[in-house]
A protein has these predicted regions:
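Formylglycine-dependent sulfatase
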Residues: 1-339, 344, 353-374, 403-422
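A contiguous, mid-protein "functional segment" used to position or interact
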Residues: 363-398
Length: 422
């Protein structure tokens, strides 16, 4: 969706076993058609370097393992899926160095080299560079100095933990059961190490982003370069006893979205946006166009217009652990979570930004629920999309030899990074 500006149900690339291969044109292809140099450094998580994915050069790319992805996780029915024995967050949690922190350091160094080389070339042609850093993705291992920034006594309390009586939504309970990272902590102290490590990885990420921005300035490009900073998803970090992404709560679906550069006024835009807006943003910035979803708009255009707090933002999930399709609609103060075959959730993000109280069963909000359901149906038919996702995943699984063979395909956890020599 980030590459193409189309929703998941439009691309039909439902999960990590269906990585992007460039067959659906994206913003990179639009730039290539305009003869704009476009390169990438770092994590892409696409299928393979050989695919025409919209980059002239892909420097040290991290792709899905073996060009296949987590096929085992595409088996989503409760009576068929596998429950991994390992721990998603990593066998060890705490201060240290991992393959991912080494990789991020390499991506940062390669980006610094790229800017220096570009500046030395005296090439004045416009260019586009995508940089993909991994942190704060698990394993939750972070260099000591960043881990030490977050002593246990300063960590915020985890909200809505099941041990305090909170009952998860049935869909969420079934999704989480496939991994259940919370249940695999050996002690409460290890759980605190995980939280401190996650925050430390965020600071490690900030450190690398800072080095990249300093290199951009040193190279002389800062004043005439537009920079966009974002992420593909958030993380629950223990809220509701959940870790990772894979659900529709704000901790999981919210991402930073910062754009800075020439002719971009400082400030905050109150119009909701999503990752699919980036396709049109990048293409239009270079005078190109892209056949993206009708719902996409350029961030520059959105920022210049009057705020539209009621603009609809949509998300969906059909991947690891999802026993049925899950769909999110954000409109104004309202957040609507639709689960095929399960009761919905409704939150008032203005009065309840932490999503503590589900209003879906409150008769006082019945009309709001109906309106949001109608808005969702204008984007897609959840039942039809859910059926299509299961059908496409079943077809893919059969192409690999059936469920027994599929259960053995793909990385068991975090994708291994490439070996890098600088």
């Amino acid at each position: 969706s980030f590459a193409t500006g189309r929703y998941v149900h439009q691309t039909r690339l439902w999960d990590n076993a269906m990585p992007y291969d460039g067959s659906i044109p994206g913003w990179g292809h639009a730039l290539q058609e305009k003869k704009i140099p476009v390169e990438s450094i770092g994590k892409l998580h696409y299928r393979a370097e050989e695919d025409p994915a919209g980059f002239d050069v892909e420097h040290i790319p991290m792709m899905v393992a073996g060009g296949v992805g987590m096929v085992w996780a595409s088996i989503r029915k409760e009576d068929e899926r596998v429950y991994p024995k390992g721990r998603m967050l990593g066998d060890y949690i705490g201060p240290g160095i991992s393959k991912y922190t080494d990789y991020d350091a390499a991506v940062t160094a390669r980006t610094q080299q790229w800017f220096a080389s570009k500046a030395a070339s005296n090439d004045t042609q416009p260019w586009c560079l995508y940089v993909g850093l991994v942190a704060p993705h698990f394993p939750l291992v972070v260099p000591q100095e960043y881990y030490d920034l977050y002593p246990f006594s300063d960590l915020p309390a985890v909200k809505l933990h099941p041990k305090n009586g909170y009952q998860r939504h049935p869909w969420v309970e079934k999704q989480n059961a496939m991994m259940d990272s919370e249940a695999k902590f050996e002690t409460d102290e290890e759980r605190l190490r995980a939280i401190a490590s996650y925050y430390g990885l965020c600071s490690w990420l900030d450190h690398n982003v800072g080095k990249i921005l300093n290199a951009l300035e040193t190279s002389g490009f800062m004043e005439n370069t537009t920079v966009i900073y974002t992420s593909d998803h958030g993380d629950n970090v223990g809220a509701r006893g959940l870790w990772g992404k894979s659900n529709l709560y704000q901790e999981s679906v919210s991402v930073p979205m910062i754009m800075a550069g020439p002719e971009i006024a400082p400030g905050t835009c109150d119009t909701p946006v999503s990752l699919i807006d980036l396709s049109k943003t990048i293409a239009m910035h270079f005078g190109a166009d892209i056949a993206s979803s009708n719902d996409t708009k350029s961030l520059a255009e959105i920022a210049k217009n009057a705020p539209d707090p009621d603009r609809v933002v949509f998300s969906e999930y059909h991947a690891v652990g999802a026993v049925s399709g899950a769909f999110m609609l954000r409109k104004g103060r309202w957040k609507y979570n639709h689960y095929v075959g399960f009761a919905p959730e409704l939150f008032d993000l203005k009065d309840d930004p932490e999503e503590l109280v589900n209003l879906a069963d409150d008769p006082a909000f019945a009309s709001t629920l109906v309106l949001l359901q109608s808005d969702l149906n204008q984007i897609c038919n959840p039942d039809e999309v859910n059926a299509q996702a299961f059908a496409d995943q079943a077809t893919m699984i059969e192409s690999y030899g059936g469920p027994e063979a599929a259960l053995k395909l793909g990385a068991p956890g975090a994708t291994p990074p490439p070996k890098v020599t600088l």
